[in-house]
Amino acid sequence: MSIVAERKRLLADRELRGSEFTLQLSDATDQWLQDLFSSVVDERQDLALIAVGGYGRRDLSPLSDLDVLLLHDDAQDIESIAESLWYPIWDQGENLGHSVRTITETLDLANEDLDTATSLLSSRIIAGSQSLADELVGLALQQWKSKTKLWLPKLAASIH
């Protein structure tokens, strides 16, 4: 499936509006990325492709960035896997916000960066190891709760 063709089909559907459109576009994007992930990666328990930010919330518009995290458990071949995932996405003309990290690296960054911390709150797995993704989400939520008194004033200040 071409995500470009699917986006055009969804845009041409005059019945789709607002949140229903964003949900269907997110679902179509999920399927496209799941197919891509399956073609690049054999079944492995040390990798997960995770949607974060607006994409994690299933709030995609036609020009939204695809914000994704390739989570790994210290995979030695991660650089070649990442390139095999990112290039087909770029070839489709997609704007890609991407990162490649372990759980520890992700939590270390989220501990210091409000944007990363909040993006993890709306993260969801697209493909790969559910247990690896669940571990990250659980630890990120614990970390968020432990830093609530620090983060909430910063979050409030960023809104104004």
Give the positions of each predicted feature.
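Core structural elements
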Residues: 2-3, 52-56, 152-160
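Hydrophobic/basic alpha-helical segments enriched in Actinobacteria
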Residues: 6-7, 21, 70-73, 81-82
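N-terminal regions immediately upstream of nucleotidyltransferase
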Residues: 1-45, 63
